């Protein structure tokens, strides 16, 4: 054996997975369950109280999802990943960690229509404000930054226009503003794509 780290292809197939100890099956099964068994009431209380790690309810996580998350983290060179049911759910999860009522974020004008609707209408109920910027005019992002700006949101490839966003230039605006840059990478094909 060598001490060589697994490559991208190996990680894509095996990261996060362990052979089943009972059957020896190599592939992670799809766990089609919503709920899990607890050892007793104290065990359940410790799980729901986030004092112990384990499966509680599939909406929160399950063994199949855990393997997906570990695999994505390994492929991206990250510490962890979080799988959610949709892109809109991902937007909510990320922005809920960054924004409070009255805060704002900057978004590129060239976005998927569903995102534009969510940002313009649904997020108002959270008290979040969106400032729109033109991805073809990097200065518009700089001009949109205010003391209430908590994040910048773009798509790597605008949907449906297909225009390529200058991620590096907008990342520099975000760095100068001291806010995270959130990049929706839905339309990119693979890790070797040139964006």
Residue ranges of each PLM-predicted region?
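N-terminal "arm"/small-domain region of PLP-dependent enzymes with the aminotransferase-like
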Residues: 2-62, 70-71
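Conserved PLP-enzyme active-site core in the AAT-like
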Residues: 2-4, 12-14, 18-21, 81-195
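Conserved N-terminal alpha-helix of the aminotransferase class I/II PLP-enzyme fold
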Residues: 40-92, 114-121
